[in-house]
Amino acid sequence: MSIAVFDSGVGGISVLKSLVEVMPNEDFIYYGDSANAPYGTKTLEQVRALTCEHAKELILNQHAKGLVVACNTATSAAVRILREQYPDVPIVGIEPAVKPAMLFMENPRVLVMATPMTIREEKLKKLMDRYRHLGEIIPLPCPGLMNFVERGDLYGDDVRQYLEELLYSYSHDEIDAVVLGCTHYPFVRKMIQEVLGDRVRVFDGGNLSLIHISEPTRRTPI
């Protein structure tokens, strides 16, 4: 039996890589729904339906013993429902690294980059509200950014221009940290760092799922 890793495209590959490093003796199934990407500009109902459909395939037909929803948008839309539907299967989602970003210094000013749907959802709003007393949190929807990653355009002029326009006001402001709230965004992390400057700390929440998935699945024999 394998651990399934699901994402709306190629973004979750970075999460899969980390899982393989932590659990080298496990077998993994990766499913990237590039045919329906991007999820971040879809409605809640659309994302929920797609996520539940693919989870059903991976758990019931592919017999996955655990599921990592390696997509912030799908996590916000459906992970609670999936846990109710499959109570005996360890299911974890991805959470933007707001907590470590707010704790790395006193009174930080933190930019949270995410898809429009992730920004709208209550899950992220509640997470940000939990740490607002520690500093300033600025949510920034990034429509279209994951499309560059899906196309493999990680270093070209088009993605640089997109990021420069998106981040212009923040590259000249006192931003202390940026949270990459989508598993696609680490693929353009270097360019984000270049646009914002070296003084800005970049946080990626992709590894937060590893602790939660590793122990329960290790107790389930392959």
Locations of the language-model features?
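Non-catalytic structural scaffold of enzyme domains
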Residues: M1-S214, R218
